[in-house]
Design a protein with these regions (language model features):
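Active-site proximal beta-strand in glycosyltransferases
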Residues: 3-4, 61-63, 76-96, 121
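Short N-terminal targeting/anchoring amphipathic segment
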Residues: 53-70, 84-86, 226
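Membrane-proximal helix-turn-helix segments that form the acceptor-binding/catalytic region
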Residues: 93, 101-120, 219
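Acidic anion/phosphate-binding donor-loop and adjacent secondary structure
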Residues: 97-98, 132, 143-163
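Conserved donor-binding/catalytic core segment of Leloir-type glycosyltransferases
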Residues: 121, 157-175, 181-189
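Short alpha-helical segment that forms part of, or immediately flanks, the ligand-binding pocket
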Residues: 215-216, 238-243, 257
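Acidic donor-binding loop of glycosyltransferase active sites
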Residues: 219-233, 246
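Short hydrophobic beta-strand element within catalytic cores of glycosyltransferases
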Residues: 238, 247-250
């Protein structure tokens, strides 16, 4: 099959540092290739360019990984009428409607629940249930939970920092690092955005790691912390921590896909 994966066009794919959605798209394309399919990535914020690039080949399936592009789905279909089309929303507050107006998500969500033409690949069962509750067409809803690839991670059975906890993620209000920065033995890693009171000059902030550095050093730690106030489902970084052998401490929003009875969750 010839499959197109449409990214947001905000950062490069594969990402050099932060970028969970971009990492997932890259992993999808890689896995598709290993299964004998063609996984073509189109990653630009320019809607006209997306449509132009898609029109240059014949695709069997097109998966748009950015809900903001809902407004060009019909144009995409007009260039590829024989292809199956799907869209996924990676918006973290789908199940919190009070947040939608603040983020300009109202129109997007309205389209997602009224759309009866294209598949909506839900990133989590939590999102699926939210759409279902608001009467989205069930024949267009499919749950497609994201996983984490394990092959490239360096595994250390005995971590070099067993008493340290890593808080890995973009430094932003939603991830709430600023709330916990004063706690000893937590080290923070992630892209700094200057949107909270988080002190980037503190000793506990290690800066932003490259993707390659993350692969090598996540297992330096005994566990990972993520107490965000909204997530699509369980974030990729938590799944990466688990396959790397770390225990995790997470908020309810980051625990949707986890078995909370396990001793390391």
């Amino acid at each position: 099959m010839n499959i197109a994966l449409v990214g947001p066009g905000i950062i490069e794919i594969p990402p050099k540092g932060w970028g969970a959605v971009e990492s997932l798209i890259w992993d999808y394309a890689t896995e598709l290739g290993e299964l004998g399919h063609e996984g073509t990535i189109i990653n630009t914020p320019d809607r006209a360019q997306i449509i132009r690039e898609l029109s240059e080949e014949q695709y069997d399936f097109i998966h748009v990984h950015y809900d903001v592009f809902y407004d060009i789905m019909d144009y995409i279909w007009s260039t590829q009428p024989a292809a199956k089309l799907a869209i996924s929303s990676h918006y973290p507050y789908i199940d919190q409607p009070d947040r939608h107006p603040y983020d300009g998500y109202d129109k997007i969500y309205k389209w997602l629940i009224e759309n009866d033409k294209y598949y909506n690949f839900c990133i989590s069962y939590k999102d699926y249930e939210t759409y279902k509750k608001d009467n989205a067409p069930l024949n267009k809803l499919l749950v497609c939970p994201n996983g984490a690839q394990h092959r490239d991670y360096n595994f250390e059975e005995k971590p070099s920092k067993p008493d340290k906890t890593i808080y890995l993620g973009k430094i932003e209000p939603r991830k709430r690092q600023y709330v916990y920065q004063a706690i000893p033995d937590i080290e923070f890693v992630g892209h700094y955005t200057n949107t909270t009171s988080f002190d980037k000059d503190a000793k506990s902030y290690l800066g932003e790691w490259s993707h390659q550095h993350k692969l090598q050093h996540v297992t330096d730690y005994g566990n990972m912390l993520l107490l965000s106030d909204g997530e699509n489902g369980t974030p990729l970084v938590i799944k990466e921590a688990l396959i790397s052998g770390l225990g995790v401490v997470v908020s309810k929003y980051a625990a949707h896909d986890l078995d909370k009875s396990l001793p390391f969750v």
